[in-house]
Every structure is written in structure tokens, then in C-alpha cells.
Amino acid sequence: MSELNEMQKLAWAGFAGGDWQENVNVRDFIQKNYTPYEGDDSFLAGPTEATTKLWESVMEGIKIENRTHAPLDFDEHTPSTIISHAPGYINKDLEKIVGLQTDEPLKRAIMPFGGIKMVEGSCKVYGRELDPKVKKIFTEYRKTHNQGVFDVYTPDILRCRKSGVLTGLPDAYGRGRIIGDYRRVALYGVDFLMKDKYAQFSSLQKDLEDGVNLEATIRLREEIAEQHRALGQLKQMAASYGYDISNPATNAQEAIQWMYFAYLAAIKSQNGAAMSFGRTATFIDVYIERDLKAGKITETEAQELVDHLVMKLRMVRFLRTPEYDQLFSGDPMWATETIAGMGLDGRTLVTKNTFRILHTLYNMGTSPEPNLTILWSEQLPENFKRFCAKVSIDTSSVQYENDDLMRPDFNNDDYAIACCVSPMIVGKQMQFFGARANLAKTLLYAINGGIDEKLGMQVGPKTAPITDEVLDFDTVMTRMDSFMDWLAKQYVTALNVIHYMHDKYSYEAALMALHDRDVYRTMACGIAGLSVAADSLSAIKYAKVKPVRGDIKDKDGNVVATNVAIDFEIEGEYPQYGNNDNRVDDIACDLVERFMKKIQKLKTYRNAVPTQSVLTITSNVVYGKKTGNTPDGRRAGAPFGPGANPMHGRDQKGAVASLTSVAKLPFAYAKDGISYTFSIVPNALGKDAEAQRRNLAGLMDGYFHHEATVEGGQHLNVNVLNREMLLDAMENPDKYPQLTIRVSGYAVRFNSLTKEQQQDVITRTFTESM
């Protein structure tokens, strides 16, 4: 082992050594130094006076945002970079963890590298004009990601975007879904990481000179140079707050602060749709435990550090357009913190700090950010399981993902969730985010020969429409299969263009600087409208579905398409997804597998491995608006079921049947995640608090139960609340300033939703029996 320098000796005193001291290996550090905790929550401390004062100050701004549905303030003059803004504070004298995206709390910045039109539109919507100098620079001199994408898009892709058969593509905003290993800055200090990056850069010289994979080698060398530069700027930004982060952190406060500065660099330089925080709780616990044992801090002070970190994560803001908000409602950032789970060696990764992170929901009230994500295992300590159930019942603010499914799949216990349901190994994998394709609309294209049922224009391949008086399942399925081939090709082509241009014009240097040199990439496609498509095909197969044909007119009343199936008459009953009926559940599983296999056949940018999610965020409302009447009886414009959820009100056999249907969806063909949002009224869980906690924990054990022959569910949002409370919150928002609920893949402050989105949430199934 090489000799440690004096700063490393000081910072690492008392830690068990290992490979982590020679190489960047945070997992090795954690495994050799963390303390599993199987006790209860009785050790937890309440908020300090400083925490309460700071949070009250922040809440004043949040209340204004909720009321106005607008930013508190934004800077329309300064393109945001790691070092663009002067230091900002809530109250410098009270903050234990410092750092804001701009110079004022909740003030937003502009990020024009992704696209100048979106920035200009955001400014205009909120009554300001983008600085003309910025517009000139990013129009005449500096090409943006958005411009690059639209220079290359095909007419077919543009039609798919217009119709809504592809929606939410990250072609005008930051793609996100990349998790920097922010822990590295705390463990090693920036100087060590810069030296490591220079070694990576130098390691490519021979390949460069020999012409090995020439274009890829040149690109990677340039990217590493940008990463090295970003680390230098990170150091500069931290220095503006009075901190020298050249060397490793020496105590818990520094470890949290160093780590947060690294994340702050990411969110100052990128406005990705999901800017996840990673898996930090157990790492932080190592430092807190060392300080507690040395008598340097008390439990109250430890909790205060965690509260102040979480407070900062609650304050992340980006300037968005109303169109973006329709897709991703309620200002989500997906500052996802992944906690708990089990280690490969059988020890739990639950620590006291896992409890502290969840306890912030009590010390500062509920909040949608950070997106607290619990990796559930049947082997988790019983005390922790009961505490999780208590938190869900009290706050409806956390989500659960199946560690027993994903840990063996990765053969790794240091993965985290990006955004909502997307797992990746921290610092070693990244994702090319791909939004989602509309399977319900694809089915209508199959029936109508590629004519869009809303616009009347030819979007899909021009084929003869199905003219049968009663739809035949085999005929429809054959056509559907062909249209899924077409859609997969349009989808992957669009994503290849998007991610080539994002790498070229809006590269995430600050995030990728905290990754290994050679990164495993996934191309994360997605599907929406699964339950609509499955129920529609079930209706065609098991009932009688007669198309009602008619003309489609444009907004001026001109006929643009004739003899199009614009509605459907259904005779008889049909099995509906969400009731543990294999007749329809098998159709849903087939659609997932079928579309994934089609995507897997196609060539991807940077040889990214194709994956797929069943996830909608809140775009289930937008998709519904863009999709006409469907053969399952759903009316034109009505929202889809979110994520992998059954359609609203169709899961009629109770919680277990609904959960069982969703758990059947094959993770092997949806490794980017399968989102299920579950709402249950408190009384359905039990008559008293103890019974409710026990039953909810048991329900999750059952849903996530995983073995070789029976796959467990992958994801579960849990809401425990009554519909009446949500109705009251719609009418009296001031009574519920922090009311938080789970929606597809994330949490949202109920008051930040539009009335239409609130109504969609209220009309969803609230399970009243197990």
C-alpha cells in the first residue's frame, strides 16, 4: 500500500483500511466501516431551533410558489454554470450545511445549453424577457442541444412528436437520470479525484495515437478533459463559500458539506428531468458514528446536520415551461435518495442514519423532495420495517423498491435509483433517458392504418385500415405487432439523435467526473398506456367490439380523414387488468416483452444496452388528452392509468389482487422499472396504529416476495389517506400547506398540482379492502 499523506491520515483516522485507500472504491469503504442497526427509532432527536427557523423561512417562499404556480424569482441574465453565481444563504448564521443554486433561496437560474427556446419561453410565461445578449449568444454563436436534435430529426419523428405517440422526449430540456457518485468528493477530496482523472486521460494516449476506435477515443478524451475542468470549478465554487475541499473530509459535517457541494455543482450546471442524489445515508453514518464515539457531536447535532442537508435538497429548483409541467407536474426534481436494502454478505445496510433521513419528514414536515426511496427486502430488520410503515401511514411521502429483485440482478449492493424506478450502480452506470411511447395510440393506429384518430393525419405507415364490423383479436394483434416494429424504430432513432446531441452540446461534466472512466450505458425506453392497451385487447378477445367509423375534421371544420374508427361499441363483459386474472394479465405481460424485444434488435448510440420502464410520471393526463376513444371503453381525453397501474376504478377485487396483477409484469423486459402507485384508506389496513403498521409491512413483504420461480413486484408508491381529505385540500389549500402524496414514481406537494391533475388523483382507485 502506498504511503498515506498527512491529510489522508487525519481524515481517515479510525477507519478500517482497504482497497478504497488505493483506488476510488466507495463501496469497499462502506463495507469495511459501516455499523448495521437493528434497533428501533427511540434514539431519534427532534429539530433544533435553528432547523425550525430556517425551515419556516423556506416555507414562506414555498407557500407563495404553491399559491401562484410560478417561480418565487429567477435570474434571466446569467446562464448557470458551476461558478456563475455568488454564494447564497437562507441565514448564514444558522446553516450547518450551505450552498444554493443562485444567490437567493428558491431563486431559479437559466440553463440555455439545452435549448434557448425553452429558456425564452419560460421567461415569457412568467412575465419577463430573456436578456437579449444571452439570446444572441445562444442563437448566433453557441449551438444548443435542442437545435442539434432538430437539425437531424426525420419527418417521421416530428409527426410522432406532434401526435403524441411519442411524448416527453428530452430534446429541449436536460435528460438527467445520471447519478454522480457525490460521496467520492467527501472520501477523497477533489485533488485526489483530479489526479485520477488525469491518469484516465493519459491512459487513452496510446489508443489515440494508434487510431483504436478513433472517434470514440477522441470523444472520451475530450469528455475526461471536461470532467477534470469541472472538478476544478467545483473546488472554486466551494471556496466561494469559505471551504477548501481539496482534501478528504475530516468529520461528519465536512463529509455532508463536501458531498452536497458536489451535488450542487451538478444542479448548477444541468437541469435534467431527474437529478438524483444517490445512496448516501450509510456512507454518512460512518462519519457520524465516528464523531459520536469520539464525543465530537451529540445525536441532536447529528440529526441537525441531516435535517440541513435534506432542507437543501428540498430547495432545488429549475425554470420550466407550463408544457413541461404537464408532463412532470408539481415541480419535481427527483433528488432521489436511496436508502436501506441488504448487503451481498447478508448484513443489512440499514444504519441509524437511515432512520435519521426518514425522521426529517417529522422534524420539518412532509415534502416531495428528496424523493425518499426505500430498498425493501424481506430480510430487513423488523424494527425498521415497522418504522417505514409508520412513515408511510403518517406522511404518504416515500416509495419502495424491491432489493431482493435488483440486488441479485446486479450482483451489487451499491446501486441507487435514478428518478423514480431506474436502478443503476453508482459511479459505474448511467442512463440515456428516453421518456415513453404510447401503446394505446399505437393500437388505434393499427386499427386505422396509421391515421391519427385526433389529428386525421397519416403518422404511422400507410396500410389498409381494419374494416371488420367486429374486431378480430388475431387480426388486430398481427397489425399491432407490425406497428410496434415501426414505433420501436422511430423511438430508438429519436433517442440516438437526442443523446448524441446532448453529449455534444450539453455534456454533464460535473456528474460524469464522479464516474469511472468506462461507464456502462443503458438506453432507457418506456411505455405508457399499458393498462389501456391490455384492457382494449382483452375486450376485443373476450367481448364483442364494434368500431364506430366517422370523419375527422380540423379546427376550421374541414374534413381531413374519412371512415376512421373514432369510437367503439362493446357488447359483453371482458376481464380487466388489475384483478389477478391471467386472461388479461398475460396480455399486459406480452406487450411489455414484445416491445422490449423489438427495441433490443435496434442499434443504439454508444452501444447503450436497451432497457424499458412502465412509468408515466403525470404524463398519463397528457397522453389521455392526445388519445381518442379506445376499445376498452375509455373516453377520448380521459387520463390513462399511471405507470403500471390498472385503469381508474377497474381493479375491483381489493389490494392483493391488484398488487398481484402488477407483480406479474416481467422485470427481465422492464429493467428500467415498473411503477405502481397504491392508495389505501387507513381503516382498510387495520383498526389501530399497531395493526396498520404490521399489515402494511406484511403487504409489502408479500408484494415484493421474490424467488427463482416467482418474481416479486419492482416498485410501490404507498398513499395512506382518505379521498375526503384530498377534496378538502382542493377547496382549502391553506389548511394543507405541506400535504404530500405519491404519484407515478415520485411524490408531489398536492397544492402544486393543477385542478385537473388534482382531480385525476382523486378519481384513482382508493383501496378499501385488503
UniProtKB/Swiss-Prot annotation:
Domain Glycine radical span(s) in chain numbering: 642-770
Gene3D superfamilies: 3.20.70.20
Keyword Transferase found: yes
One Pfam family named in its UniProt record: Gly_radical
Ranges of residues in domain PFL: 5-635
Biological processes, Gene Ontology terms: glucose metabolic process
EC number: 2.3.1.54
Record's catalysed reaction(s): formate + acetyl-CoA = pyruvate + CoA
Positions bearing Glycine radical: G745
Pathway field: Fermentation; pyruvate fermentation; formate from pyruvate: step 1/1
GO cellular component labels: cytosol
Localization (cell): Cytoplasm
Origin: domain of life: Bacteria
Active-site annotation: C419, C420
MF (Gene Ontology): formate C-acetyltransferase activity
InterPro entries: Auton_GlycylRad_Cofactor, Form_AcTrfase, Form_AcTrfase_GR_CS, Gly_radical, PFL_dom
Keywords, comma-separated and alphabetical: Acyltransferase, Carbohydrate metabolism, Cytoplasm, Glucose metabolism, Organic radical, Transferase
Family statement drawn from the similarity comment of this UniProt entry: Belongs to the glycyl radical enzyme (GRE) family. PFL subfamily.
Note: Several mechanisms have been proposed based on complexes formed with substrate analogs. After activation by the glycine radical, the cysteine radical, Cys-420, can abstract hydrogen atoms from the other active site cysteine, Cys-419, and from coenzyme A, and it can also transfer hydrogen atoms to product radicals. The other active site cysteine can attack the central carbonyl of pyruvate and covalently bind the product acetyl group.
Subunit structure as annotated in this protein's UniProt entry: Homodimer.
Main function: Catalyzes the conversion of pyruvate to formate and acetyl-CoA.
UniProt protein name: Formate acetyltransferase
Organism expressing this protein natively: Haemophilus influenzae (strain ATCC 51907 / DSM 11121 / KW20 / Rd)
Gene: pflB
